[in-house]
Amino acid sequence: MYFVFSVLITVTLLISAPAYAKPLTFSVEQVFVDEDNHDLRRVGELEFISGISVTSDNKRFGGLSDLHVNPDGQMIAITDKGNRLAAQLVFDRHGSLVGLTNGDITKLQTPKGKKLKGKKKSDAEGLTRTKDGWFVSFEHKQRIWFFPGTDPAVVAATKISPPKGLKDMPANGGLESLVELVDGRLLTFSEDLENAPSQTQGWLRTGKAWENIYLSRS
């Protein structure tokens, strides 16, 4: 006989805003590999530790595209609405993720220091941390920006010279993934642009120079 249960945690997160601002409230629900067997932890080579489903009635929340977790457990995420979400991950004594605290959600800034507006200009998809700041890739209006410092939401973006071929990507199938490699090079892949059938277009940036690379999909 199986017992199905869920743990619902409501966490009130106070954002850095005036006292009259509405608190950012999350509902956090534990998720499992198998809702009928919560002890199932391994699927093939994958070991599942823990997971949560996060919702909020705040209209700014949602559409998380990519995230980075600092060694101290602080999460920095970007959304397809051009927001940066920061929150502290909460773990129980067994090391399972159970909640979020200290949340803040703020619009990213353009190179002119203005907050992003409009879906086509705000669809952030890829995020990667470097020793000097953050690279963020965008769809629709295809581009990569750099945000110096420890928080991408408090500084104006810096434009990055893009690789050739960005205009060939579908509006909603652009630079979906972005990562800085251990040697400092920047790697990015398109979601839908193909060089050949089952061969996804990507680019590798060394210094300020881009080169084409391709990922074959089986």
Task: Enumerate the predicted regions with their spans.
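Bacterial N-terminal signal peptides
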Residues: 4-15
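Sequence/structural signature of beta-propeller domains
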Residues: 17-218
